A protein has these predicted regions:
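A short helix-loop-beta-strand connector motif used in the catalytic cores of GNAT acetyltransferases and
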Residues: 42-53, 74
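Conserved beta-strand in the GNAT
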Residues: 53, 59-67, 74-79
Length: 157
């Protein structure tokens, strides 16, 4: 599996992948349509942020968006093609995002989790530290992971 920077012209395909990924869970078609309208994955966003894709056999199988803010990295998106769920792609993308965040000086990785994916994120070492209201009217868990500090020790969220 290759992980590489996304290209701006892939924004539409990545947004469609996110909708397919969300559709893996038991959401209604109406909810998925509302979700699609909230996506802000434009060519400009891809070009100006840390957006990386995973490819298997030259086909995009997932992606993540990583934002950087004063020692904190925010995993803004992590989505997989439904066929990739449970095949290790999510783990590889998450580990890549955490390592990339640490390499850029972040001490903590934080994200708002898809509720159906909380178990995955807990297996990755994430802990729920709060809750936030989503634009879609749901409560989402806010999760954090301490990253390797400059002395090699893990920081706590």
């Amino acid at each position: 599996m290759l992980i590489r920077p996304a290209r701006a012209e892939e924004a539409g395909a990545l947004a469609a992948l996110a909708v397919r990924s969300k559709g893996h869970w038991p959401y209604s078609a109406a909810f998925l349509k509302r979700f699609e309208r909230t996506l802000a994955l434009t060519p400009e966003v891809v070009a100006s942020n840390d957006v990386l894709v995973a490819e298997r056999d030259s086909v995009v199988s997932g992606f993540y968006v990583l934002l950087h803010r004063d020692g904190l990295a925010v995993l803004d998106d992590l989505w997989l093609e439904p066929a990739e769920i449970g095949r290790g792609c999510g783990r590889k993308l998450f580990e890549h995002a955490a390592a990339r965040a640490a390499a850029r000086g972040a001490r903590v990785l934080e994200w708002e989790a898809e509720p159906y994916a909380v178990g995955f994120y807990e297996r990755m070492g994430g802990e729920t530290v709060g809750w936030v209201d989503s634009p879609l009217g749901r409560r989402l868990p806010v999760m954090r992971l301490g990253l390797e500090g400059p002395e090699g020790g893990t920081t706590t969220p």
